[in-house]
Amino acid sequence: MIIAGTVIGAGMLANPTATSGVWFAGSLVVLLYTWFSMLSSGLMILEVNTHYPHGASFDTMVKDLLGPAWNVINGVAVAFVLYLLTYAYIFVGGDLTAKGIGSAVGGEISLTVGQLVFFGILAFCVWASARLVDRFTSILIGGMVLTFIWATGGLIADAKMPVLFDTQAPTGTSYWIYVATALPVCLASFGFHGNVSSLLKYFKGDAPKVAKSLWAGTLIALVIYVLWQIAIQGNLPRSEFAPVIAAEGQVSVLIETLSKFAQTGNMDKVLTLFSYMAIATSFLGVTLGLFDYIADIFKWNDSISGRTKTAALTFLPPLISCLLFPTGFVTAIGYVGLAATIWTGIIPAMLLYRSRHKFGVGKNYKVYGGFWLMVWVFLFGIINIAAQILSQMELVPVFKG
């Protein structure tokens, strides 16, 4: 459940908007392509990890197999992504916590208090143990499934096939010209790679069990993403997405626009609850990966003293940044996907290639495929980097409804 919780973040709510250019059939292809590539790269990391002691993370593997230069590049990319995501989750989760507490007590609660409450409870879980994170995440995932079904069950049943499978692009154009803007968002929807080493440690080196959890967690996410696409793109016509795109996929605007074509009821409140649980599970998964990554770098053990030092370096920088600069890093967040592609696409393929030459296949696990899979994942990384750069420079078509 740690993998499913990490992958299924509140960002998935924006997937129908990000893929509105390629629409439903195109989004299925992009989601399947991204799911397979990201799962494969995660399994590559797992195989490489079997050659190292339990607890060894990216720092140990990249330094040993690719050298100090690549280790610096990878380390900066990993730290940038995980710290920035932690910052973002504290900010958004704290805001929702403050509003929830304020509504419950009938008063106004400051953002700072909300952030400290949200952070304190979840950070304690990560400091305590991966087992507690797993159990808490399982509860939250159950709540997410219930709220998701509650919010979208009727919409999925009422989905209209002519709307869902709309393929009438304007004359002389194609839906596929918008694929570059869809790829980076879908990649961000399948990020779990920082947790592979944590899971191998949690399962005491049982790599096949870790592989099963990666398959199960990412498949759960894929199914939920496809159902969400059906719920939205099966009811809201492609030609009516302009206000949603202008609002950058904001959930309230999406629901308001959708309500003109379908019964939405209390969907906004239910999706807010879903978002809150999704943010909490993502926070737990991301920070657990960051926690073990930092412990590996400094070789701090699992004693109370060691875990406390690791927790301090894991949580204090993003917490202090969030309290001092509650609206900062907005521009930097746009580059999270670019940095993540380095260590979720390019680095895993390089690691497996060097690992196979140095050690042979994994000790008790071998990822499917061979050299062709390494090339596939490496090219997946290159394609996503190109797509993100071209999209941010506005050198590719952008669908605006």
Report residues per predicted region.
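Transmembrane alpha-helical segments of multi-pass small-molecule transport proteins
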Residues: 1-7, 76, 100-129, 144-151, ...
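Hydrophobic transmembrane alpha-helices that form the core helical bundles
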Residues: 40-106, 272-296
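Hydrophobic alpha-helical segments of multi-pass membrane transport proteins
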Residues: 145-154, 277-289, 313-317, 336-362
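Loop-to-transmembrane helix boundary motifs in multi-pass membrane proteins
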Residues: 108-117, 206, 216-224, 233, ...
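A generic transmembrane alpha-helix motif of multi-pass inner-membrane proteins
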Residues: 327-401
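Extracellular loop-to-transmembrane helix junctions
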Residues: 16-47, 59, 220, 399-401
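Helix-loop-helix junctions that connect adjacent transmembrane segments
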Residues: 108-117, 129-131, 135-249, 253-256, ...
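TM-loop-TM module centered on a large, flexible mid-protein loop between adjacent transmembrane helices
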Residues: 56-68, 221-279, 300
